[in-house]
Amino acid sequence: MSVRNTYLRYGSVAMAFHWVIALLIIANVLLGFWFAEFIERGDPMKFTVAQWHKSIGLSVLVLSILRVVWRLMNPHPPPPWPTPLMRGLSMVSHYAFYFLILAIPITGYVMTSASPLGNGTDYFGFFTWPNLPIFQGMTRAQLRPIHETWETTHVVLAWSAIVLLPVHVGAALYHHFRLRDDVLKRMLPGTTIA
């Protein structure tokens, strides 16, 4: 398998970015639900799970930036769109995903930086990822509305990704089982394309 994308399929780097980011996002959605809905305020586990959530989010951000750079340097294989409508829907959903995989962690980072608690991110226990310096010196009263605005934005974007994910998976399965083309195989390692 080629490292770079070819006319027929994605290369190993693009596949790795796709699947690693997808798994990290799914893990982070689950962690986000867990600490937001099921862990009581004041429970020390809430802080720990929140740190994992933030660490994964920052990892998604870094990997997504690298993925966008890689995509700009390696054009993707041309998809076999059977209709102009499918072409348009595919392009909109892919650009929406690229926007979301960047915007969700960015809004999370800004939200964390504007938190009245002032905690940085303990990046997987290796080091503290610093907050944005723009919020330093602000009082809790000044930070609270900023934090809440970014938190709301973060949650709305996360829900948008949750809604878009089954559409993306459904479209890949539709291509594979209904149209019987190679769209899904192009992103799966170890598959052959006719």
Language model features with spans:
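Membrane-embedded alpha-helical bundles that constitute the cytochrome b-like, heme-associated redox core
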Residues: M1-A194
